């Protein structure tokens, strides 16, 4: 089975410009392809994870990846799928975020001479002359076609700024530039990027008379059609300081029964034969599948040691074995206690489990908090400082969030 057939079997391919030519290129290690990453935060998240895995798979098959850091396009902001304009970031913020991205990408992709490349589109976009750009590529874009593009669809009623309207042209120019300078012949991206990607292939065809190709990756959606990779508290990050390895593990351990095998197939590197054998699993076997998914993805992102710790901590909570010391924890300072006690509301806020006293109050009143398996029945409950000595206490928020609180 070639790599193209494997990607298809894993459900990763959404749309392609020319299936036969793309199959020929990737199966024979002839694709020099890029995926763009705009630097809108200081960490990659689960939405980027699928793209990184795709790059790794294709590199293992002999193809050459280009990780394009969007130092220039981030200055504009991608309107795809947005209801409002993205927050404008400073150049310093973007440069910092780009450095964070580089460090995380190096855990997945092998960079170096003859291997993967990492480029930053700020190196060419920031120096463009506007008049020259209009003359060089402006005539290749139809405003009528651009206005019909799906990437602008959600913004047309609420207002699309001219700044954002230029995003497609900038992304297309990236492909055009790299096609000429580093032989990049293919672009991959999320299915919501299809219009922007076609802009690039068309620009290359019209300006250079040559073929370039595009393929979109299936969006990671749950059985309800919602994007995966987000929790009630926000995105699931790849940075362990933003989403702990335990919380990352728990996110995947708690996916729905209808989604677990799809996630294993799309995101892990387990052999397809092994995954196909799981298709008949049901009931308690699906819990085993969720453990496999959580462990494999945590190992990919955070390493085997952290995956083992997260799995042990989860089993301690749900199976009555192992140690709880590896779950997320907060050391409470002396100042948090008044007369040797701390209230339930303050405890939740101090541990970052609630953003405010009001949120903590509502959570307790709804019966959503337990400490050491004892439900917190009232907002007036207090805890003695002595209870937090040693391993401390385990706080349970809802059904799936656990946190350890202790004192020095």
Can you say where each PLM-predicted feature lies in the sequence?
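Positively charged, low-complexity intrinsically disordered leader regions
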Residues: 1-33
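Divalent-metal (Mg2+/Mn2+/Ca2+)-assisted nucleotide/phosphate chemistry catalytic cores
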Residues: 10, 90-91, 97-216, 222
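N-terminal catalytic cores of NTP/NDP-binding nucleotidyl/phosphoryl-transfer enzymes
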Residues: 21-79, 188-194
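Short, hydrophobic/aliphatic alpha-helical segments
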Residues: 28-36, 58, 65, 172-181, ...
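Buried hydrophobic packing segments
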Residues: 51-58, 178, 196-204, 297, ...
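Short acidic, glycine/serine/threonine-rich loops at helix termini
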Residues: 77-81, 128-134, 226-232
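A charged helix-plus-loop insertion that forms the helical arch/lid used to bind
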Residues: 79-95
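Conserved nucleotide- and phosphate/pyrophosphate-binding catalytic cores
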Residues: 204-408
């Amino acid at each position: 089975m070639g790599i193209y057939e494997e990607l298809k079997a894993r459900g990763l391919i959404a749309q392609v410009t020319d299936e036969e030519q793309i199959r020929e290129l990737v199966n024979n290690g002839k694709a020099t392809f890029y995926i763009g990453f705009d630097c809108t935060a200081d960490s990659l998240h689960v939405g980027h994870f699928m793209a990184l895995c795709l790059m790794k798979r294709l590199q293992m098959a002999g193809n050459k990846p280009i990780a394009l850091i969007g130092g220039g396009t981030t200055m504009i902001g991608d309107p795809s799928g947005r209801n409002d304009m993205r927050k404008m970031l400073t150049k310093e913020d973007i440069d910092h975020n780009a450095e964070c991205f580089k460090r995380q990408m190096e855990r997945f992709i092998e960079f170096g001479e003859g291997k993967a490349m990492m480029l930053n589109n700020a190196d060419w976009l920031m120096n463009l002359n506007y008049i020259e750009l209009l003359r060089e590529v402006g005539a290749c874009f139809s405003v009528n076609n651009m206005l019909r593009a799906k990437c602008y669809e959600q913004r047309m009623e609420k207002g699309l700024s001219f700044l954002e309207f230029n995003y497609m042209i900038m992304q297309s120019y990236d492909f055009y530039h790299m096609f000429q300078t580093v032989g990049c012949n293919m672009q991959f991206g999320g299915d919501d990027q299809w219009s922007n990607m076609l802009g690039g292939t068309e620009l290359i065809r019209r300006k250079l008379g040559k073929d370039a190709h595009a393929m979109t990756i299936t969006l990671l959606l749950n059985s309800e059609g919602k994007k995966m990779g987000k929790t009630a508290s926000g995105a699931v990050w790849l940075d362990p300081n933003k989403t702990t390895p335990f919380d990352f593990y728990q996110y995947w351990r708690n996916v729905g029964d209808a989604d677990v095998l799809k996630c294993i197939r799309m995101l892990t590197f387990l052999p397809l034969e092994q995954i196909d054998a799981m298709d008949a699993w049901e009931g308690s076997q699906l819990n085993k599948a969720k453990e496999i998914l959580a462990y494999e993805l945590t190992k990919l992102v955070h390493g085997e040691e952290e995956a083992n710790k997260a799995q042990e901590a989860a089993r301690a909570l749900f199976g009555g074995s192992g140690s709880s010391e590896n779950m997320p924890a907060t050391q409470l300072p002396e100042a948090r206690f008044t007369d040797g006690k701390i209230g339930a509301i303050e405890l939740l806020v101090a541990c970052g489990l609630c953003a405010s006293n009001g949120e903590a109050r509502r959570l307790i009143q709804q019966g959503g908090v337990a400490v050491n398996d004892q439900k917190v029945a009232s907002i007036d409950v207090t805890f003695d400082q002595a209870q937090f000595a040693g391993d401390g206490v385990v706080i349970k928020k809802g059904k799936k969030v656990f946190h350890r609180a202790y004192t020095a």
